[in-house]
Amino acid sequence: MSGPRSGSGSGGSTGRPGDAESRRSAYEKEAHELTTQVAFLEEEVAMLRRRLSESPRQVRVLEERLAEVQAELSSATGQNDRLVATLREARDQIVTLKEEVDRLAQPPSGYGIFVSRYDDGTVDVFTQGRKLRVTVSPSVDVGSLSPGQEVMLNEALNVVEARSFERQGEIVLLKEVLESGDRALVIGHTDEERVVMLAQPLLDGPIRAGDSLLIEPRSGYAFERVPKSEVEELVLEEVPDIGYEQIGGLKSQIESIRDSVELPFLYKDLYREHQLKPPKGVLLYGPPGCGKTLIAKAVANSLAKKVEAITGQGNGRAFFLNIKGPELLNKFVGETERQIRLVFQRAREKASEGMPVIVFFDEMDSIFRTRGSGVSSDVENTIVPQLLSEIDGVEQLENVIVIGASNREDMIDPAILRPGRLDVKIKVERPDAEAARDIFAKYVVPSLPLYPEDLAEFDGNREATVAAMIQRVVERMYAESEENRFLEVTYANGDKEVLYFKDFNSGAMIENIVARAKKMAVKAHIEGGLKGLRMQYLLAACLDEFKENEDLPNTTNPDDWARISGKKGERIVYIRTLVTGTKGTEAGRSIDTIANTGQYL
C-alpha cells in the first residue's frame, strides 16, 4: 500500500500542487476557527466563573433592594391609611358642620303649656298669651301629657316634645280649692284674687288653704306647693334631744309643767270624765340663763316618748314649733300678724294628724308687750290681739299648747297672762345651793379624767372625789363672805342692800364655770402637767367667772337691769360695786337714773 500511495503521491504532488495548498489553507482556517472558538469558550468560562463568584454579592444587593422596596411600600401604606383617616375625619366634620348650619338655620322653637286633648289627636296649648289647638308629632305620646305640662312647639306650632312642669313664676296664697277640684282661688302679693288651674302635681297631692303655690301668671296654672320660707325660718319642727334628766335644780318646775302639758294629752279620758279642761298655755318666767328654754325643749322630747309608748309605734313624735320672737317683727304693716297666723295654722295642721304640738315663744316680752307702752310705734296694738285670737282659737283643738318664756313678765300684756290663755305660770328662779349641786353634777361626772392627787385624797373613789369637788365649789360660790360681795343697791325709799354673787348665779353660769375648769385642765396637760380635772381649777374658774361679771351692772337704768336679772320689788336708784380686786375695794360709781318709763332706752 505504501508503494502505490508513494508513487501516486509523488506523482500527485508533482502533478497537483494547488490541492495541497488549498487543503492546508482549509486546515489553517479550520484551526483558526477552532482556536477562535476555544478562545471564546475560554472567555465564556472565565465570564461564567466571574459571574459565579459575583452572584452572592448580587443576591445580597437584591435582597437589600427588596427590603428597601418593602419598607417604602409599608410607609406608603401607612401614609395611605392616615390619609384615609384624615379624609374620613374631614368628611365627618363637614357633615357635622352642615348639620350645625342646618340647625342654626332652623326657625326658633317655642314653648307652651298643655291644656287638654281631643279624640282626633289634636291638643289645646297655651302659648304667647293665646290658646291654640295644634297637632302633635307622632314621636310624642299624647296620652302621657298632663294638664299644665310644658311642651315644645316647632315653627308650625306643632307639639314636637314633652317637657317637665314649669319651675319658676310667682308665689300666691291659696284661699280655697273650688268644687271642680282642678281650680283654686288664690291671693296675689297685692291681695288681688284670681282663679287658677291646678297642674297634675297639685292634683295628686293634698293642698290646704294658706299654702303657698307657684303659678305662671300668663297661663294661669299653679304647678307646685312651695314651703313657707318665712315660717320655716322661725319654726323648728324637730323635737330636741333633751331629757328631764339632763336638767338640774328644777325638779318642782319640771313637775309643774309635766302636769300642765303631759297629763292632759296622755289621760284625755280622765280629764273628760272629770270635766277638766286642759290649759291652753304655760308661761315660764325668771332670770336669764336659768333653764326656761331647756325645760320647754325637754317637754317636747318627753311628750314624744310618751306618745310612742302609748301608741306602740316606733314613729311616735311630738312637734315643737320654736318661734324666734324678735324675728317675727317686720317693718311692713301686717306682716308680723300674718306670720303669727301662719305659725298657728302650721300648728293646727300638725295637730290634725293626732300628734301633740307645742308652740314655744322665746323672749315673749319682745313682741307681746303691753298695749300702749310703745314709744316710737304702736305695733303691739295689733300683734297682741292677733295672738289672743289665735290662742282662743286653740280651744277647738285638743293637741296644741302654747309655752312662752320671758325674763320680763311684767312687760307682757296682761290680757295674754289672764286665766284661760296662759293659764299656768311657772317661775324659774335662780338656783340655790342645793340646786347648784344638782346642776354641777350634770357636768362634773365621775367618768371625767380626775387629777391624781385629788383622787388619791379619797383613796381612788371617783364618786367621792367628784362629790367633794362639787361641795367645795358650791360652798365657795354661796358663802356670804367679804370676797363674794358684789353690789350695794339703794332703793327709792332710801334702803340699802348688799347683793352677793350667789344672787346672780344661774345654770348657764355654772356650765360656763365647769367649761373654764376643763379648759384649764387641758392646757395644763398640754404644757406637761398631770392630766385630769382638779378642785383648784374649779375654784379658779369660779373666781374668773365672778370677775368677768364685775362691769355688767353698769347700765343707764339700774332698775331695768335689776328687773331683767330677777330682782323685783322697790325701784333701784343707785348701784355701787363691791368687788374686791388687787387694789382693794373699788369705790361705788354713781349711775345716772332716768325717769322710769317702763321701756328699754
Swiss-Prot record:
Q: Where is the composition biased (Gly residues)?
A: 1-15
Annotated region described as Disordered, given as residue ranges = 1-31
Per the record, its GO cellular-component terms are: proteasome complex
Which stretches are annotated as coiled coil? 18-106
Region (Docks into pockets in the proteasome alpha-ring) residue ranges read 600-601
Record remark: domains: Consists of three main regions, an N-terminal coiled-coil domain that binds to protein Pup and functions as a docking station, an interdomain involved in ARC hexamerization, and a C-terminal ATPase domain of the AAA type.
The record's function comment reads: ATPase which is responsible for recognizing, binding, unfolding and translocation of pupylated proteins into the bacterial 20S proteasome core particle. May be essential for opening the gate of the 20S proteasome via an interaction with its C-terminus, thereby allowing substrate entry and access to the site of proteolysis. Thus, the C-termini of the proteasomal ATPase may function like a 'key in a lock' to induce gate opening and therefore regulate proteolysis.
Subunit architecture:
Homohexamer. Assembles into a hexameric ring structure that caps the 20S proteasome core. Strongly interacts with the prokaryotic ubiquitin-like protein Pup through a hydrophobic interface; the interacting region of ARC lies in its N-terminal coiled-coil domain. There is one Pup binding site per ARC hexamer ring. Upon ATP-binding, the C-terminus of ARC interacts with the alpha-rings of the proteasome core, possibly by binding to the intersubunit pockets.
- State the name under which the record lists this protein: Proteasome-associated ATPase
Recorded source organism is Frankia alni (strain DSM 45986 / CECT 9034 / ACN14a)
